[in-house]
């Protein structure tokens, strides 16, 4: 409980624990309170500790409490937390002893881990030279160059760093580098017993048993230098190369970890580290814990070499997994310590133990841990708080999101490890065609206008007809929105869609376009909206959440004009043609010399973006449907909600294949059982005209249209003829000046 314990200093010798508790209980409930006394007396040593249950009480105590019985006192947040021990030991023991002992134990373990072996070392190199080289990577605590009894060097050395991170940097930086004219090999130093095991494994004809353990548990922390110093002393000066080969046998099987944790030694006995080798299950999301067993007793039991290996395997260890109190933590930082993890978990209840899983060879953290609570309720609280749907977004430690699951037995963990998670292989995503489906007669259809229901039925019929073509697939990220008001533009629609996904993080809309009528539109004028639009999201989860919130929502545009939202249908062939067209245009742009370089760069950037959009659309069909958040938009009007379930179908030949989730089996209005006997009054419809009547009407219309056309043509020709006659008259007889032409007499009448 970091930050919940206060250190109270400058207390008078007469101070008692009950007085201190009475003072601090005025601020809030005190979980623990005691003063540190002198040995053999009740006189206070001048300081004490107070632990609260809530952080708010700690802040109040720091501000309000400044005196104790008239004396001024110092109240600060305690730096170190006392270990969980019984109440009697807390009251009687000295407060400094529980701090010093764990530090001493941890320091030893850390020292042994952050130790490197340097092989192929030059005889001219001294300890000071080595220290000067490795000081660049961190604090060097010790440099040891083993020597023979006659004082000659053996050709290798050990370098001890302060922590594991610095040792890892030195291993990366100094490996295969020259020191005093000789290329050195740097690796992790390994314990003596593991060195022996590696030697036996590398020897020909010797089979290494998996259950082999050291005979004496007290020799576990010994290092390779002990084995090397016990080797034959009658070797020559140039025999250090052979020694390097012996050392390399232990360096090869060791996997290098960047970081590790310091392993605490809790009083409760826990199983040996090598029992957790297969515990980190990445895909199964589960874990196992084989119970609590005393490590020393297990090591002593294995000293008996007469017991066959088969009997050892059959021996079942006691397990506490069935109690439901043990949890398995994954995604743990390699720097996280058991004490810090315990402080995070202790807010849910008292802990029995916390154990970080270490690698059996390097003794570095594997990034996972086990923790057992005293009660099952505390474990359930921890699981609930660790879920991503919790208020705080789960549990975090050292900047990493912790994944917490209930521990399972070793057998169940083996089954989970071998069990393959079958991923859906469908490429058309037909199951998404059902998303948002609303049938007449369902609860979601209540209050929907008849015009909207007619539109939905028409769109559903068109969707079924299009999906009969194998080249058409349902997009996972692109939405098609119908029944939009004419006044809605791109910006307003984008804003509404972002509001629909306000609970999600990192929502990005790649495209949001309202389709418009572009006929007869010139300049900057926008055409009239066609009442539908397309919106493409970056992630399927965000598109699904927006659909479930937006579809049939009466609060957006009113109950009489509800939006109709569905996943868009894409044509694989058209997307390929579009991609080829973009590639051709890019090639043309590259081939043409452009004077203005910035404009060219801008165009290329724009084309690259378009190409990425098209590629993402084409790859969309092959993506496996992701996990959907069922809580998104779970309202009465949102319509049918799909689940990306993977079902198996057994074929006649005995083989199994994935069941393809097809389109909805039921269409049209839903007729409930209670309404089956009732006769519904259908709206009166006009009788459809017969085929003969239709033909007669068409002929009449055609004849009525053709008659005026013929008359118009005849009138035109007659007018043209009259015009020509008039022109000839004017040429022959002269222009008429408004007076009627006089009839001229013939020549023979004179």
From Swiss-Prot:
Glycyl lysine isopeptide (Lys-Gly) (interchain with G-Cter in SUMO2) crosslink site(s): 643
Pfam families associated with the record: RRM_1 (PF00076)
Biased composition (Basic and acidic residues): 85-100, 208-226, 598-611
CDD domains per the UniProt record, alphabetical: RRM1_RBM28_like (cd12413), RRM2_RBM28_like (cd12414), RRM3_RBM28_like (cd12415), RRM4_RBM28_like (cd12416)
An example Gene Ontology biological process: mRNA processing
Sites of N-acetylalanine modification: 2
Biased composition, class Polar residues, residue ranges: 612-622
InterPro entries per the UniProt record, alphabetical: Nucleotide-bd_a/b_plait_sf (IPR012677), RBD_domain_sf (IPR035979), RRM_dom (IPR000504), RRM_MRD1_RNA_proc_ribogen (IPR051945)
Residue intervals of the RRM domain: 4-80, 114-191, 325-409, 477-582
Gene Ontology molecular-function annotations: RNA binding
GO terms under cellular component: nucleolus; spliceosomal complex
Source domain of life: Eukaryota
Positions of modified residues (Phosphoserine): 122, 231, 239, 387
Subcellular location: Nucleus, Nucleolus
Compositional bias per record (Basic residues), positions renumbered to this chain: 679-698
Region (Disordered): 84-110, 195-320, 587-716
Segments of skewed composition (Acidic residues): 227-246, 268-283, 291-308
Record-given protein name: RNA-binding protein 28
Organism of this sequence: Mus musculus (Mouse)
